Design a protein with these regions (language model features):
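Short, charged/polar surface micro-motifs in flexible loops or helix N-caps
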Residues: 39-41, 50-53, 74, 111-113
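Ligand-binding loop in jelly-roll beta-barrel domains
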Residues: 90-115
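A short, N-terminal "cap"/entry segment at the start of jelly-roll beta-barrel domains
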Residues: 1-40, 121-123
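Conserved hydrophobic/aromatic beta-strand scaffold that supports enzyme active sites
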Residues: 31-33, 44-48, 65, 85-87, ...
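Short acidic-glycine-tyrosine-enriched beta hairpin
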Residues: 75-95
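Residue-level marker of beta-strand positions
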Residues: 54, 84-85, 103
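Glycine- and acidic-residue-biased ligand/ion/polar-headgroup-sensing regions
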Residues: 51, 59-75
Length: 123
């Protein structure tokens, strides 16, 4: 099978230490966009929430997978703590908060409406 033509080489290495954190419209939330395919919506990002920061209630456009690296992410369904993983189905709604801060690796099949707007603005 031929490599994906999205890259000049068969692999694309992303040096996270050379990437700056990008502020988002949500106070206390920063992201590093690791991969985004506008044609399909596929998005991989690191997200960092300051202690007490949250994300306004939103609906997932498609499957989202989150691996919490540090801290915890809490919503009305429970808490996902460091070293753990949560999957959110298409159509699920929540308003997560990070009581003690949180750093997470997030995979979206399609970004939420708010993330889509942010990506369109070039963040």
């Amino acid at each position: 099978m031929a490599p994906d033509t999205a890259f000049a080489l068969a692999s694309r290495f992303v040096e996270l230490d050379t990437m700056a954190w990008t502020d988002t419209p949500n106070p206390g939330m920063k992201v590093k966009i690791l991969y985004h395919d506008p044609a399909t919506g596929l998005l991989t990002m690191l997200s960092k929430l300051a202690p007490g920061a949250g994300i306004p209630e939103h609906t997932h456009e498609d499957l989202e997978q989150t691996f919490v690296l540090e801290g915890s992410l809490v919503d009305d369904e429970g808490a996902c703590t460091a070293g753990n993983f949560v999957i959110r189905a298409k159509g699920s709604r929540h308003a997560p908060v990070a009581p003690n801060g949180c750093t997470m690796l997030v995979f979206f099949m399609k970004p939420t409406a708010a993330l889509s707007k942010m990506l369109q603005k070039g963040h």
